[in-house]
Amino acid sequence: MIRRSVLALLAVAAMVMGCVVVASPAGAAIDTAVVVPSPNSGARSNVLKSVSCVSTTSCVAVGYYVGASAYQSLVLNWDGTSWTKVDSPNSGSNANVLNSVSCVTASSCVAVGWYVAESGTESQSLVLNWDGTRWTKADSPNPGASNNFLNSVSCVTASSCVAVGTYADDVQVSTSRSFVVNWDGTSWTKAESPNTGIYDNVLNSVSCVSESSCVAAGYYVNGAGTQSLVLKWDGTSWTKLDSPNSGSFSNIVSSVSCATGFSCLAVGRFDNGIGSVDQTLVLLLTGPEPPATTTTSSTTSTDPVAPAFTG
């Protein structure tokens, strides 16, 4: 009786203050890992490189398999019970590889990667769109004469996605430049992205929490070696964030994930300079949080603020 009275008083207090009391979600309760059967195409190598889930009964995994003469795109769908292979388009008869997938609903996914043109020498960006029924190839920019690779994609809505990677500079063909493309629901367009120095700049991963808040990460090469590379998007432009390096020679960021517009983690590896032994690298990216506001029953949520990371 006492407990019910206390709960009743709390409920009344919440209504008087115009606030909604919501129970906190339980912590992670995963305690078991099992191998789930998944289909393979042919008797040669099958590789899954990325997965995206929108519910326990809707996931998509992508990668590639080795066909009769070249790599072919590979897409599997999860329905809560089993994985099934889904037909996915391939451009030409040469290699087609999917590196990353991002879904916002069961009927809206984007997968990105690369394929080799019919000439057999130029790699082109590859983007596939899922509409809930089938995968179709989308037109995507290729700023370089060769080596146009998309390594990662992040979608916040069906009409807002960002994909990142690298392409070969037309002037210095052996030099890679940062590559960012945006999806607005209609077309993919190349965005201007900064490069550090005259040597390689490669983006391996991107994470968006809103249309105006994304972080991309990878590495660039200078005279001292390979350095961590972090770019941030504020809804208007991409800018480089000063990021630390643990190793004196090699620092590579392979993945980034943002929980909010002011809190991200980036991970990868660095060379400790002793016998070329790689060590784990973790970068905490933070920025000033927005001012606290009082939440009332009539308040509507807004997009997270653009990242203002301090390093």
Identify the meaning behind each predicted range:
Residues 1-10:
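Bacterial N-terminal signal peptides that target proteins for export
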Residues 4-5, 19-291:
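Residue-level hotspots at or immediately adjacent to binding/recognition sites across diverse folds
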Residues 9-20:
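Bacterial N-terminal signal peptides
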Residues 291-311:
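C-terminal cell-surface addressing/anchoring modules of secreted/extracellular proteins
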